[in-house]
Amino acid sequence: PKTASPAKVSATKGYGANVVLEGSTYDESWAHAQKIASETNATIIHAFDDSHVIAGQGVIGLEIIEQLPNVDEIYVPIGGGGLVAGIITAVKEKNPHVKIIGVESSAYPAMKKSLENNTLETVRGDTTIADGISVKTPGKLTFDIVKQKIDKIVTVDDSDIINAMFLLMERSKAVVEPAGAVALAYILKHKPE
């Protein structure tokens, strides 16, 4: 999207990519990317609603289970749902008792709304610091997986995300993008069950 962070754009260009900034949301950018792919006969891979992408992200769940075999809960950021779909599939296969809690930005609660209504929903969306998870409509494939396996979806506000980012900088000397801080943001504001 046109709102992509300069750091992400620069890093992507650094890999040799031709970056086209179009649309104000992921959904608008995806539509434009599909148009370019069609016009240029290019291969296009969806960022989250693709079985291979979901499987690849599932490896994170396997690593969590390997490193923390007694884990009770895992909090996962949700935008379009690919990350949570992959993690939940892998983790629930290994240990169905682990609770998976998805965390969305309160500005883009698309998966939460979709689950509440048992159908894919498109949210209007609002300004958020968490651009990496600002998705108006979850993926169909990801929605189908998440609705069968998720334990709960919660939301966090930008102020909570910023607090989590600052804590990570101060205590861990880690600089994370806002989408990567949403799980900690929720945990800091609400004690895990």
Sequence positions of predicted segments:
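PLP-dependent amino-acid enzyme catalytic core
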Residues: 1-193
